[in-house]
Amino acid sequence: MRSKGVAMADNVISREPKYVGFWMRLFAFFIDSLILTVIIALILIAIFGRNYIQLSMQGKTLWADILFQVVLPALAAILFWRYRGATPGKMLISARIVDARTFGPPSTGKLVGRYFAYLASIIPLFLGFLWIAFDKRKQGWHDKLAGTVVINVEDED
């Protein structure tokens, strides 16, 4: 496989790639959020009917809320990262998550760590995500903690 300006061999990049910046990653996040919201809403309405919100406010859907709003998004993200290198939103913008040192696929452990490291990026007023806009390699704090970067793979053959 070859990429414009970046030599590829066994899914490892031999030269510095083009990193994906803040605005494109934010766009990908919104796409992923929209897809997940629709899927989760359809599942919850199928299970609880149209009065899901009322039942949720009464505390009658806690198990489903945790399963479908916490566990499902985590599993979906980690599985997409592991098997596709990106979530649907990142695939749409031709981006891929790779190991920051080798530019190859990150280990599953790194990907799980990356997901949970989102908390470090979120808690202090989303500063860990804003960091992407100013970082040389466009890494958020979750990327730095997990040892990953997000690169553009648009020109891959």
PLM feature spans:
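Membrane-interfacial and juxtamembrane segments of integral membrane proteins
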Residues: R2-D157
